UniProtKB/Swiss-Prot annotation:
Gene field: mtnA
Organism from which the protein derives: Methylobacterium nodulans (strain LMG 21967 / CNCM I-2342 / ORS 2060)
Keyword Isomerase set for record: yes
Protein name: Methylthioribose-1-phosphate isomerase
Annotated site residues (Transition state stabilizer) in this chain: C161
Keywords, comma-separated and alphabetical: Amino-acid biosynthesis, Isomerase, Methionine biosynthesis
Length: 364
């Protein structure tokens, strides 16, 4: 995607492999900064502190992080240690584990002195696959938007959190259909949930849509149900950090409430995700997906730009009050209209996914 007319990806290696560059998403939307990662530890910290975030992107970042670490210690013990360190950064998104397992499986049989360059090459392939998958998700999802637009009016899409190009290498998942539809001339407007506590919708999704010229409106998290009751939303499209083999969707906290409101009001509710987000080993998302509990300070404090152009962090919660901060929730498959994948739109059922991924039937 483009920033001020210049194409960017969220992550890209420096020539020669001395560093991997990422967009520092903690600085958006008020500052656009590139950060260099030179070690596995720096990659892990970037994932942990959400300099990079979004399930597909943290998977790619972990892959490059493993490659960076193997430059210093390519031994068997080093491979296992670095992979374990990166895997522990964020427990919910399955793409992280998927990318590390893919690399580790390729690298273990190799002589140690060949592992680092092979890891960089494979991380690059994962990144390119992500771009292709997200573009395909965009094409499939755009057809859903176009079908709604055929009724003769603007299509209003509600999205939650940020599942755009900032959450992937490029294009995004939930926002990819919107970009493809918009670029094709389909009249589309997006309601952007602010997405507390980190305000990733207001800060990141709005930033993306504004840069791309997509009409949008930022709304408070609690406004979605009201909008649906009054016919203001035609469909919901969200991303996913982990989707079970039976179609349960784990996504940013608050997604479940939007799905309930959509179900009650007859609004189609879709999740957009690449195959790397599907956890084929799980059938019950509520019982089986570990939910990351983040620092309560994300709830009690807000950081933003002041009127004089500076930045400040303020406390917004009564001092001394206990805080809970689960980062994700699980939307049961029964509330999900469909799963938009790189191979097409699947029913949110085990059979629906297996029809798109028949090669998983033997493994399922």
């Amino acid at each position: 995607m483009k920033i001020d007319g210049r194409p960017y990806r969220t992550i890209f290696p420096e020539p020669g492999g001395d560093a991997v560059c990422v967009i520092d998403q903690t600085r958006l939307p008020f500052a656009f900064e590139i950060r260099r990662l030179t070690t596995a530890e720096e990659a892990a910290e970037a994932i942990r502190t959400m300099v990079v975030r979004g399930a597909p992107l943290i998977g790619v970042t972990a892959a490059y992080g493993l490659a960076l670490g193997l430059r210093r210690d390519p031994s068997d013990a080093g491979l296992e240690r670095i992979a374990a360190m990166l895997a522990a950064t964020r427990p919910t998104a399955v793409n992280l584990r998927w990318a590390l397992e893919r690399l580790s499986g390729i690298l273990r049989p190799l002589p140690p002195d060949t592992r680092a360059p092979q890891a960089f090459a494979e991380a690059g392939r994962i990144a390119e696959e992500d771009v292709a998958n997200c573009r395909a998700i965009g094409e499939h999802g755009a057809r859903l938007i176009a079908q709604t637009a055929a009724k003769g009016r603007r299509v209003n899409v509600l999205t939650h959190c940020n599942a755009g190009w900032l959450a992937t290498v490029d294009w995004g998942t939930a926002l990819a259909p919107i970009y493809v539809a918009h670029d094709a001339g389909v009249p589309v407007h997006v309601f952007v949930d602010e997405t507390r506590p980190r305000n990733q919708g207001a800060a990141l999704t709005a930033f993306e849509l504004n840069a791309h010229g997509v009409p949008h409106t930022v709304v408070a998290d609690n406004a979605g149900g009201h909008l649906m009751q009054h016919g203001g939303v035609d469909l919901c499209i969200v991303g996913s950090d982990r989707t079970t083999s039976t179609g349960d969707v784990c996504n940013k906290i608050g997604t479940y409430l939007k799905a309930l409101a959509a179900f009650d009001n007859g609004v189609p509710f879709y999740a957009a995700l690449p195959v790397s987000t599907i956890d084929w080993t799980l059938t019950d998302g509520v019982a089986g997906i570990p939910i990351e509990e983040r620092d309560g300070r994300e709830v009690t404090h807000l950081t933003g730009r002041t009127e004089d152009g500076g930045f400040a962090t303020i406390q917004v919660v009564s001092p001394g009050s206990p805080v809970a901060n689960p980062a994700f929730d699980v939307t049961p498959a029964r509330l999900v209209t469909g799963l938009i994948t790189e191979r097409g739109v699947a029913e949110a059922t085990e059979e629906g996914l297996l029809r798109l991924y028949p090669e998983r039937r033997k493994a399922a």
